[in-house]
């Protein structure tokens, strides 16, 4: 039975929560990750894992994704919510605080041939930094 776009996205989210290191079961090798300033754009699964997923995983442990709503339209899925995590590693120059924080996000996923080919994401960095004691607006 063929999985729906939404099933693939939800399975990937569950794998990231479990901190599975090999993302190749969920993402194409030439996967594009396009994010707001602070995350940047990552071309290919290797760059995504090396330059975003691993540093994020190392900085924030005990992750739980609390996605509030999903939408699906053909080979596209979208969601918004937050990731609850404990800050236990360096993040954007901030030493570990041990704080449990919420990381707000919005994601748009494109699935091709049963794997994620593209992710457009917005992460609320001002909200993250404020929870870590850095108010960038003051």
Predicted segment positions?
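A solvent-exposed, acidic/Ser-Thr-rich amphipathic alpha-helical stretch
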Residues: 6-8, 21, 25-75, 82-84
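Short, well-ordered beta-to-alpha junction loops that form the rim of enzyme active sites
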Residues: 81-83, 121-122
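Short, low-complexity N-terminal intrinsically disordered segments enriched in polar/charged residues
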Residues: 1-29, 135-138
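A short, structured loop/turn motif at beta-sheet edges
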Residues: 70-78, 110-117
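A structural feature that tracks compact, well-ordered secondary-structure segments
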Residues: 3, 11-15, 51, 68-69, ...
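Exposed beta-sheet edge and beta->alpha loop/turn motif
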Residues: 86-112
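Low-complexity, intrinsically disordered terminal/linker segments enriched in charged
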Residues: 118-138
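Intrinsic, low-complexity N-terminal interaction/targeting segments
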Residues: 78-80, 92
